[in-house]
Amino acid sequence: MANKIKISGSEPVKYGPHDFQLGDYVYAPVSLNDPSQGNQLAYIDQQDKEGCTIIFAQTDRTVYREYDDLYLVPITEEWFKENPQVFTPSDDMKPLEGNPSFSYQYKFTAKRFSCEYRIVVYELYYEDEEEYQRLCREGLNYFTCLDESRGKATIAQIAAMNPVSKIPGRYICKPTGVMQIVSIHDLQHFLRLCGCEELKVPQTLLEG
């Protein structure tokens, strides 16, 4: 079984029914009796106070797992590349001075609000303790599967593009931070709020 990791300065978060929605992607142990089988990607089909019924994406097998058995799905670029019905590559945002450079960025439209958002992604390797400490001071709690995160923390920040002035032919827009996320299920929640289509499981993750 993969391990949850704790970044210094943050306290473990206990997850429960209020943290998840139907359709959310999670990692869960294939077998509770044989940890050597590892975790597989699954989605939540039903919920109650103690746990949820999940369906493994690769096998369609249905099992019940308590919330303590679940692990967050780290953000990787496959989720953006393989969901073009939601995301479009972008390159028009630059990091603030002193911040890490973006690993990649995308844009998407909130159909419900007629608003366009940018999502920029940082990738930080676990040994980069100084950067972690700074992010923790800014309020970041980061937990995920150690194996599935490929040795790095991925932090995505969503920004709304707000027009602040107009010059002939175009608006000058300023990005305004909306939220910071570290897991796919949090991204799913925001996209649902925006009226976007549901994310499909990247084929590369199913084949891995």
What name fits each language-model region?
Residues 57-61, 94-178:
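Acidic, low-complexity, intrinsically disordered interaction modules
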Residues 52-53:
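Short aromatic-glycine-enriched beta-strand elements
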